[in-house]
Every structure is written in structure tokens, then in C-alpha cells.
Amino acid sequence: CISIAKKNKIIVAVTGAIDYVTDGNVTYAIEGGHEMMTKVTATGCALTCLIGAAIAVGENKVLSTASIIGIYGLAGEMACKISQGPGSLRMNLLDNLYNMSSDEIMSNVKIKNA
């Protein structure tokens, strides 16, 4: 990922059990999310839209990308705790994104330099 980001002068984000974001110079590791999120169609598409919005207004585009991935993962974790399956997860994920407080974000989003 780092070599691709450097060579093409882009930000690369790879999601999985631990998510990684890099511009080739700075790399972040983000913990969060839940396996059930992979069962809901369009969660990745929605995340991409949120990343686009964040980098449009954020000065530090790599950190903005990592932050949104962390927030989205946290919303997914919270949603999975109360969801019965993928259908209710979709609804609860959106509700958690809408209702999440800045205190919840600051206390629970796990972003580290990798």
C-alpha cells in the first residue's frame, strides 16, 4: 500500500480486521468495525462517500480518511450490539452515525500511527 500511495501520489485505504490508511509518508492503523458489516450491501460505498466528504473539507486528508474510517467502524460496532441481523444493522448503523456524540468519538475511536 505504501509503495502504491507514494508512486501514484494518492491516499490508499485498506479495510479489514485492522484498517490501514497511508499516503506513502504517514500510515495509520484503525481498529474497529464488526464482521457483520461485511454482510450488508453498500456499507463500503457509504464509507467511500463519507471519506469523500471528509477530505473535501479536511486539511489533513490522510487523517481525515482515517478518522472517518474509525468513526464508521465505531458506529458499526455500536450497531452490531443491538442488531438482530444485517437488515437491522443497516438501520442501526445509520442511526448511530447520526446520533454519535463527539465525546463518544473521542473516547472510542482507535487510530494509531502504524
Map each language-model feature to its residues.
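Alpha-helical scaffold segments in soluble metabolic enzymes
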Residues: 3, 7, 49-54, 67-70, ...
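Conserved phosphate-donor
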Residues: 1-37
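Conserved post-catalytic alpha-helical subdomain immediately downstream of the catalytic base
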Residues: 51-89
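Short glycine/threonine-rich catalytic loop with a Thr-x-Gly-x-Asp
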Residues: 34-51, 61, 86
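N-terminal loops that bind phosphate or other acidic moieties
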Residues: 19-33, 58, 81-84, 98-99, ...
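Charged C-terminal helix
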Residues: 74-114
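Short coil/turn connectors at secondary-structure junctions
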Residues: 7-9, 25, 43-46, 59-61
